[in-house]
Amino acid sequence: MYRFFVNEKQENFFILTNLTLNHIKTVRIKNENFICVYQNEFYLVRLVPNSNKAEIIEKIKGNNEPKNKVVLALAILKTKSFEFAIQKAVEIGVNEIWPFYSKNVSQKLSGDLEKKLKRWEQICLHSAQQSFRNLIPKINLPINYKDLLEQAKNFPVKLISFERAKNNINIPDNPQNTIIIIGPEGGFDDVEIQQAEKLGFQSITLGKRILRSETAAIFLLTKCIKD
């Protein structure tokens, strides 16, 4: 069953945006019921013919969000890899995504950053709809590595992936809010790791094999997110 996030409710109807209406037209929804997600809750609805409204049939109970908040701080990657990581992170259950620049980031974003952010937000939206999320994870404009560490220092669990780390993954059994930092293709240098460790980050290895950044993000998210 198709699902769409909506922001406006009038009495027993949701107001659908032109973007949502175009999607509904593309998938040829006419008489079939579908689901609207409004303020993190699910509603079974039907389209009102020749209008921009969906009539509410009933509210559906359900919470598909993880027990803990997990933030993915991901270094800027090549466009295809970065967008793939966003998509899969949302499907797995990430709460927020913080893009960042570090020393070895080779991919420099050019052009209109706000336009790129809009595209990332659309990926988050479509992935959240596809995976039946109650909310759309937030993704931010890129920040530098130093600012990232400062913003992340108060998380109860702070992990940074580093191929030369001696520690294996040790995730607490009880769900806790967590931030994980995944570096660029060139990894982190020793100074960057030391900066993170001074603020309480645990540097961890993901195993004997070197993973691509997008693969490392998926692997670590599946370990940290608690359903």
UniProtKB/Swiss-Prot annotation:
A Pfam family reported for this protein in Swiss-Prot or TrEMBL: Methyltrans_RNA
Gene3D superfamilies membership: 3.40.1280.10, Hypothetical PUA domain-like, domain 1 (2.40.240.20)
The keyword Amino-acid biosynthesis appears for this protein: no
Lineage: superkingdom: Bacteria
Name of the protein: Ribosomal RNA small subunit methyltransferase E
Role summary: Specifically methylates the N3 position of the uracil ring of uridine 1498 (m3U1498) in 16S rRNA. Acts on the fully assembled 30S ribosomal subunit.
GO BP annotation list: rRNA base methylation
GO molecular function, one term: rRNA (uridine-N3-)-methyltransferase activity
Catalytic activity: uridine(1498) in 16S rRNA + S-adenosyl-L-methionine = N(3)-methyluridine(1498) in 16S rRNA + S-adenosyl-L-homocysteine + H(+)
Gene Ontology cellular component list: cytoplasm
Organism: Mesomycoplasma hyopneumoniae (strain 232) (Mycoplasma hyopneumoniae)
Taxonomic placement: Bacteria, Bacillati, Mycoplasmatota, Mycoplasmoidales, Metamycoplasmataceae
Family the entry assigns: Belongs to the RNA methyltransferase RsmE family.
Alphabetic keyword roster: Cytoplasm, Methyltransferase, rRNA processing, S-adenosyl-L-methionine, Transferase
Entry EC number(s): 2.1.1.193
Enzyme class label: transferase
Compartments reported by the entry: Cytoplasm
